[in-house]
Amino acid sequence: MVLENLTPAVKVTAPANFRPGIEFDGTEGTATTEGMTAQPNFDDFLLERGYSPAEYEIIGNPRTSQWQRYDGEWLTSYRFHFRKKSSVIDLPTLFAEAKKTKPTKPKKVLDENKAFVICPADFQIGKTGSRGGTKETIERVLNSYARIEEHLKKNPYGQILILDIGDVIESFSSTATYNQLEGNDLSPMQQTDAAASLLWSLLKMASKYAPVKMGSVASNHCQNRFNGQQVGKPGLDDWGIVILQQLKRLATEVGLDVTFYVPNPYEEAFTIDVFNDGFHHLAAAHGHQAKRPENVPTWWRQMTFGNQPSISAASILVTGHFHHTRILEAGASHNGGSRWWIQASTSDAGSDWFARIAGEDSMPAITCFELQKGVYFQGAILRF
C-alpha cells in the first residue's frame, strides 16, 4: 500500500510591517523585540537600550508574533508596553475605586444635634518640597484620614460636613509657573486623578458614620488660566469643582447619602445652614482673595457690608491658602454669639520658599471641628 503524501505545514513568515525597536513619547512606550528562540528578560531588554528598570516599568501582557526561519527554526518576537515610573503610590483610578464601593448605612447610633466638620485644605497634589512629593503627601493625607476615622468611631454625629477648602492640586499655571514645571512630579491630569481618588476615599469613609454634606470652593491653584490670567467663570471653571462634580456622579451611582455644594458660577465661596435652623451659618472660601492672612477679617467685613451672598451671612468662616492654623473671634453674629474665622492647616509637601523668606513653617494636618445645634461655637478645633 502506498502512503499518501502528507501536506507540509504552512510556512509562517515575519509580518511584512515587522520592525523591531522602541517607540517612546516621554511617558509611555512600546517595545518590539527581534525574533528570538526563547523569551527574553524584558527588563534586561530595556536596560540594554538605555531604559533602566529603576525608572521604567512594564505594563500589561506582551503580545507575540511567530515565524519560521530559513533553516526551519521558529522565532518569536515580543511586543510589550512600558512607562516611566511615577512617584505616586499605587492608587486606583477614580472609577475603578468607585466600582468597589458598596452603599453603606451609617451606624445606628446618631446624635442629630451634633455635626462634625472636616476641612481638607491645600493638598496641592503634584507639588514637591522638603516634605517629599506626591507619594509622601498621599501617605500624610491617608494617615490623617485614619485618625479622623478613629474619632468618628468613638463619637456619634448626625451629619458630617467635608469642606474642600481649595488648592487640592498644584497645577502648572499659578504665579510659580516655571518652578512648577521643574518641580512637579505629576502632570495636571494625573494630579486631578490622584486628588479625586483621595477625596473619594474620604467621602466613602465618612459616609459609613453619618449622612454627608460635601462642598468645594474655587481656589488659585485650581483656577482655569491662560497665560497666567484667570479665564472663565470662577465658580465653575475650577479643577476642585470639576472633581466634586465627578464625585457627585459616583456617589449617586453607588447610592451614598451625600449632598453637594459649590459656589455660584460667578462667585468663589458658599455658605451652608448646617442644621437648617438659621443658627450655624458655615462659610467656606479659599482665602486668596484677601492676599494676606491678616486681611481676612477685613475682607469678610467688606463682603458682609456689601451683602455678598457667598459669605455675608456666615457665623463661621473657614479659609485655607495660608498654610497654617489660626483661630480668631471676629465680631458679633446674627445668632447672638460671636463670628469665628478658622484658618485651616495644609497637608502639602512644604512651602520652602516662604520658610526661606520668613523663617517659619507649619506642621501639616487636616483641621476639624464640632458644631452643636443651638449652641454657640467657642473656637475649639481638632487637628488630625
Stretches found by the model and what they are:
Residues 108-118, 271-283, 336-339:
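Beta-strand-turn-beta hairpins that frame and shape the catalytic cleft
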Residues 121-123, 166-169, 218-224, 286-289, ...:
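Active-site metal-binding loops of divalent metal-dependent hydrolases
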Residues 212-220, 259-268:
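Acidic carboxylate-rich catalytic motifs and surrounding loops in phosphoryl-/glycosyl-chemistry enzymes
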